[in-house]
């Protein structure tokens, strides 16, 4: 038996909006410690990892480990029927091929339940090792989102370079080039407005902007984003989910065919 009750139901809606563009079908894994998902995008270029810890739910019951295969677009359609202030309960019986979503309005004068068929999805769990990164950038998620959007109007790729001076986002396209530099800025009134750079050594990597733009759909979940970079590793773009967990996106760097862009 599985029963999860989430008071801030809007959080689950935001999670779905953050990942459904990348991933169509995925297994949600429930265990005693939390509700998680790990899935590759259809082209096997990006990986998304989600964790919602059990203690973040008002009520969390998971009698045994359970994997529920869901179509994320269908799940998003159901969650759109919930009000932003609704309490969301997810229920599934052992061995059942359906999952039930229950939406309660805060004053409990309206309760709706939606049942959705589960799917059999073959998925392999990739062990993601904890790594040391050459550079870690923390910055306002809205700023990162704006940069990716602005650069997309010029080019298809972004070069992210971290030096002592700051973090530079660059692109080049048919109409010209663009460079945006964010300097370290810790002396802000609000911690969420800070840009903090921890650098062991300078690093410069190239990524596809369409993926970066897709990752920024998680911005409503967190006011800060953490970007971890190392020359031999995929970038990790992480959005912390307050008190509960995180969404992490992993993307392999592009091997730059066009050397002119580097010069």
From Swiss-Prot:
InterPro entries: DNA_clamp_sf, Pr_cel_nuc_antig, Pr_cel_nuc_antig_C, Pr_cel_nuc_antig_CS, Pr_cel_nuc_antig_N. Residues 61-80 bind DNA. GO terms for cellular component: nucleus; PCNA complex. Gene3D superfamilies: 3.70.10.10. GO terms for molecular function: chromatin binding; damaged DNA binding; DNA polymerase processivity factor activity. Expressed in proliferating tissues. Expressed in roots and root apex. Expressed at low levels in young leaves. Not detected in mature leaves. Highly expressed in shoot apical meristem (SAM). Expressed in flag leaves and panicles. It is found in: Nucleus. Keywords: DNA replication, DNA-binding, Nucleus. GO terms for biological process: cellular response to UV; leading strand elongation; mismatch repair; positive regulation of DNA repair; positive regulation of DNA replication; protein homotrimerization; translesion synthesis. Induction: Induced by the cell cycle inhibitors aphidicolin and hydroxyurea. Induced by gamma irradiation. Induced by heavy ion irradiation. Induced by UV and hydrogen peroxide. Down-regulated during sucrose starvation. It holds the Pfam family PCNA_N. NCBIfam families: pcna (TIGR00590). Belongs to the PCNA family. Homotrimer. Interacts with FEN1A. Interacts with POLL. Interacts with RAD/GEN1. Interacts with DJA7 and DJA8. HAMAP family: DNApol_clamp_arch. This protein is an auxiliary protein of DNA polymerase delta and is involved in the control of eukaryotic DNA replication by increasing the polymerase's processibility during elongation of the leading strand. This is Proliferating cell nuclear antigen.
